[in-house]
A protein has these predicted regions:
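Nucleotide-activated donor-dependent transferases that construct or modify glycoconjugates
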Residues: 3-11
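Short acidic, S/G/P-rich loop/turn micro-motifs used as interaction or catalytic elements
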Residues: 11-15, 42, 85-92, 113-114
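Histidine-anchored nucleotide/phosphate-binding helix
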Residues: 17-29
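Short internal beta-strands
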Residues: 33-39, 106-111
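N-terminal beta-loop-helix "entrance" segment that forms/cooperates
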Residues: 40-62
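Glycine-rich, charge-decorated loop segments at or immediately adjacent to ligand/cofactor-binding or catalytic sites
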Residues: 47, 113-126
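N-terminal glycine-rich phosphate/adenylate-binding segment common to multiple enzyme folds
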Residues: 76-105
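Conserved small/polar residues in nucleotide/adenosyl-binding loops
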Residues: 139-141
């Protein structure tokens, strides 16, 4: 495996940015070239989280829709694609990539509805599932 794509959706849950930086570090340490595609907000948060560019290569940050278009038109493909899923939209992107890419597909499914989301996957892919949400409670003074 020499190339990987990390596909980010809306950064509603902060854990997505941290996990992306963690994966960027590990994959790059393994000698894998990594591209990241995401919404403008997700890419901006990622860039802000790594101001000195230790993990994020600005040349390998791509608009989500443009990246999907490149995959669909077979202008680019990857050996591994990791899709972050915390909503139905993430499931749609996961299904789209499964249909247009030859990459080994891994879904990182997180959020309050993680268990329900994983049950909706009807095709072969690896899954990592964790609720990974902040538990807001009353402050005790």
């Amino acid at each position: 495996m020499t190339t990987a794509l990390l596909l980010l959706g809306c950064p509603e849950l902060p854990v997505q940015t941290s996990l992306t930086l963690y994966l960027l570090s590990g994959l790059r340490d393994a000698g894998i070239e990594v591209a990241v595609a995401g919404t403008d907000a997700a890419l901006s948060l990622l860039t802000v989280a790594d101001p000195k560019g230790h993990y994020v290569d600005p040349a390998e940050l791509h608009n989500l829709d443009t990246c999907i278009e490149s995959l669909a038109e077979q202008r680019r493909d990857f050996d591994l694609c990791v899709v972050f899923v915390h909503s139905d939209t993430g499931l749609s992107y996961l299904g789209t990539v499964q249909g247009i890419s030859k990459a080994r597909l891994v879904a990182i499914i997180f959020g309050r509805e993680a268990d329900a989301l994983v049950e909706q996957i009807t095709f072969e892919c690896e899954t990592l599932v964790a609720k990974a949400v902040h538990k807001i409670g009353r402050a005790h003074v």
